[in-house]
């Protein structure tokens, strides 16, 4: 995968997880719900008589991530606190032999922070 593809996949995953967390969806059912946003949005609409779209889910995730980021900054956390331990970057993971490629400042920039 290219860097742009990794960033896009990571961001999409984080947005869905943040939305699911905000809605209180059970972590054990997320193998189903996190891959089927349309299903979740339709269930919310059916239960509450709303007319939400999948864009709502994406925007909820964006807002949640932004609030979490700001909360952490207000609490005094910095990019240094977001950094993985050094061995993630130096010790290859079997069986692929890959190591982490991105550091906190790069990740946060990709999220728009």
Regions found by a protein language model. Give the residues of each.
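Extended C-terminal regions of large enzymes
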Residues: 1-113
């Amino acid at each position: 995968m290219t860097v742009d593809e990794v960033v896009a996949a990571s961001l999409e995953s984080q947005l869905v997880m943040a939305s699911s967390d905000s809605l209180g969806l059970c972590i054990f059912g997320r193998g189903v719900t996190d891959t089927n946003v349309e299903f979740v949005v339709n269930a919310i609409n059916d239960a509450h008589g709303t007319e939400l779209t999948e864009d709502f889910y994406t925007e909820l995730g964006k807002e949640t991530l932004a609030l979490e980021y700001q909360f952490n900054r207000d609490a005094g956390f910095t990019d240094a606190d977001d950094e993985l331990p050094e061995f993630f970057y130096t010790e290859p993971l079997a069986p692929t032999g890959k190591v982490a490629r991105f550091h906190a400042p790069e990740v946060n920039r990709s999220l728009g922070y």
